[in-house]
Amino acid sequence: MDRKNSQNPAAVTPARRRLLDTATRLFYAEGIHAVGIDRIIAEAGVAKATFYNHFPSKDDLVLAYVEEQDRLGREAVAALPKQSPRKMIAAILGRISAAVAPGGWRGCPFLNAAAEYPDQNSPVRRAIGARRKWYHDVLKQLLAADGDPTPSVTASLLVALSDGLLEIAYLDDAKDVPTLVREGLERLLVRR
């Protein structure tokens, strides 16, 4: 897979931006494998040659989509106001409530993409795995700074809580998510 410009937002041409924006909208709304390249090209208003200049294959586009979602998430966490480790954890998980609140939530884009790419050795799954490791490590570092006696275990539980909340918001009712975030944090962080 070609990784040209995949993580450098400044290097993104207008055509590439339209392709990524169109793919993001369609992949999220309809599913990755349900959307063909021809439709993405048509809706982005680019020539087929332009698509292939930026993405040698659809899998390259999917990888760029996953990497961009990862980059945006990391930037959002980095932009959170610096506060105590416990409040940072609450703010990070609180982003779940903010993400699902506007409506139109169709589940976590990473979990959705993973479901469509079952081969754990595929570049898409490796990118998702790197995202999950980063998320776990951020939580683990904050938990260690907060004095958690088993920060890796608690971080794994918080990742599982996050995954569950993202899917509950899609499958059940997003209005319950803020309460579940608060309750989950109270129960998991009370361990010390």
Regions found by a protein language model. Name each.
Residues 1-6, 98, 130-149, 171-192:
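C-terminal peripheral helix-coil segments that are non-catalytic and often amphipathic
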Residues 45-55:
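Short hydrophobic/aromatic patch on the recognition helix
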Residues 74-80, 87-90, 120-145, 153-156, ...:
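Amphipathic alpha-helical packing segments from all-alpha helical-bundle domains
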Residues 100-126:
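Amphipathic alpha-helical segments used for helix-helix packing
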Residues 64, 77-104, 155-158:
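Hydrophobic alpha-helical connector segments
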